[in-house]
UniProtKB/Swiss-Prot annotation:
Catalyzes the conversion of dethiobiotin (DTB) to biotin by the insertion of a sulfur atom into dethiobiotin via a radical-based mechanism. Pathway: Cofactor biosynthesis; biotin biosynthesis; biotin from 7,8-diaminononanoate: step 2/2. Its cofactor is [4Fe-4S] cluster; [2Fe-2S] cluster. PROSITE patterns: RADICAL_SAM. One of its GO terms (biological process) is biotin biosynthetic process. This is Biotin synthase. Residues 58-283 form the Radical SAM core domain. [4Fe-4S] cluster binds at residues 73, 77, 80. It catalyses: (4R,5S)-dethiobiotin + (sulfur carrier)-SH + 2 reduced [2Fe-2S]-[ferredoxin] + 2 S-adenosyl-L-methionine = (sulfur carrier)-H + biotin + 2 5'-deoxyadenosine + 2 L-methionine + 2 oxidized [2Fe-2S]-[ferredoxin]. Pfam families: BATS, Radical_SAM. SMART domains: BATS, Elp3. It is an enzyme of class 2 (transferase). [2Fe-2S] cluster binds at residues 116, 149, 208, 278.
Length: 337
């Protein structure tokens, strides 16, 4: 009896392991994908799309985000213009509840299922928690949309309070691989972020955790990050691409090449076959319109529509038109769900 040859091509391995069996790539396998030449990009994106369609389905989840408290953050995340430690043009400001509700209404009109309230803080104080509670209640009373929050690091009491408010999902990004994190943030640790995510999961809220690509990490660290996210098993992974902000320590870094960004999108899909993988900040400057289409046909199954926290995004209509062109049903508008 002739023994079947051992498969050594990483995409053939991924086809059998991920597409057929639903088992995500290991760290070493993800690294092999990230090292593929541009001549195999189309093949890679096609496989990632097949994986997404088989294990997640065709629906695309749409989300909007709003900044409840902008700027003045005491942390030194080197990519962020909201840090009070850097000479960036962003200044501290609070959003009132009526404006928050109106933003949720406008987001819901796009077909979004998720509306995320974000605050630039290390972690929420009593004033912010009270404002969030009022905002969540007002939105739930007036808008048919699920509410998520992103408020930094939490105590157990705050986690329990958010769960009691009916917060559906909590976002807290690990941002990058554990080995690279000290080069990105020095005012708190990667482990502190992990602890918040663990408490969120144990409280019954969905976990949203991703990061930013293009912050000087190596391909090895990118693969490490994907493996660490796979260990966490978040419900959603937002993938941002560094949009260098003036006045920040990363303000002079180069934008990630589009082919490298698309390879990363596909690699993360192959490492996380069943996870909601969301296009987030920086895709406009990194990928443009063509790259956005390639990403959605290369593993992405969720988008943030409209603007981000301190940068402009694509108009919501542009993303919705693109999804229509690609025949990708929007989750909130799909009557079968």
């Amino acid at each position: 009896m002739t023994q079947a040859p051992v498969q050594t091509d990483i995409l053939e391995i991924a086809r059998e392991q991920v597409l057929e069996r639903g088992e995500g790539l290991t760290q070493d396998q993800t690294l092999a994908v990230l090292r593929l030449g541009d001549d195999r990009l189309e093949e890679l994106l096609g496989l990632a799309h097949e994986v997404r369609m088989k294990w997640c389905g065709p629906e695309v989840e749409v989300e909007g985000i709003i900044s409840l408290k902008t700027g003045g953050c005491p942390e030194d995340c080197h990519f962020c213009s909201q840090s009070g430690l850097f000479q960036s043009p962003v200044r501290a400001a609070w959003l009132d509840i009526p404006s928050l509700v109106e933003a949720a209404k406008q987001t819901a009109k796009t077909g979004a299922t998720e509306f995320c309230i974000v605050a630039a803080v290390r972690g929420p104080d009593a004033r912010l928690m009270a404002q969030v509670a009022a905002g969540v209640e007002a939105i739930r009373n007036e808008v048919d949309i699920q509410v998520a929050c992103s408020l930094g690091m939490l105590t157990q009491e705050q986690v329990d309070q958010l769960a009691a408010m009916g917060v559906h999902r909590y976002n807290h990004n690990l941002e990058t691989a554990k080995s690279h994190f000290p080069n990105v943030v020095t005012t708190h640790t990667w482990e502190e972020r992990w602890d918040t995510l663990r408490m969120v999961r144990e409280a019954g809220m969905e976990v949203c955790c991703g990061g930013i690509l293009g912050m000087g990490e190596t391909l090895e660290q990118r693969a490490e990050f994907a493996a660490q996210l796979a260990e966490l098993e978040p419900d959603e992974v937002p993938l941002n691409f560094l949009n260098p902000r003036p006045g920040t320590p990363f303000g002079d870094l180069e934008v990630l090449p589009a082919s490298e960004a698309l390879k990363a999108v596909a690699a993360f899909r192959l490492a996380l076959p069943r996870t909601i993988l969301r296009f987030a900040g920086g895709r406009e400057i990194t990928l443009g319109d063509l790259g956005a289409k390639q990403g959605i046909l290369g593993g992405i199954n969720a988008v943030i529509v409209g603007n981000y926290l301190t940068t402009l995004g694509r108009p919501a209509e542009s993303d919705l038109d693109l999804l229509g062109e690609l025949k990708m049903p929007i989750k909130a508008l799909n009557e079968t769900l």
